Amino acid sequence: MRTNAQAAGLKDAVIVNTCAVTAEAERQARQTIRRLRRERPGARIIVTGCAAQLSPKKFADMPEVDRVVGNAEKLEPGGLVGDDGIHVSDIMEIKETAGHLLEGYEERTRAFVQVQQGCDHRCTFCIIPFARGRNRSVSIDRVIEQVQKLVSNGYK
């Protein structure tokens, strides 16, 4: 997301990546958004993540929020910019796993490679299939490519 934000020319923007696992996580996300607006009144606040995917209108209705972006759209080059308040598609229509960008690990000792996204189980207690979509696997060639890139950058 950082690369996409920089490429789009977003200068004074804050991206809030929300969680929907519990009501408390959503409450904390809304609290964080309100605090960020107080601390950075001129910043563009963009909300994404699972809670935003599931309840885009709830976040778009917050006066502090400038844009709500879905889980698929946050990885698109132009997904973070635009004047429409809500840019969220039907996650169940996504058939492929977006290329996971290997970024943001420069100062870290660990990095992660995404191999799968979504879930096909419909456990009665779990919201993940509705926030992340159906199970989609990254191709083995893409996983190997990502691992090789990390190894060449010094990760073990």
List each model region and its residues.
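Proteins enriched for Cys/Gly/acidic motifs involved in redox and nucleic-acid/cofactor modification
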Residues: M1-K156
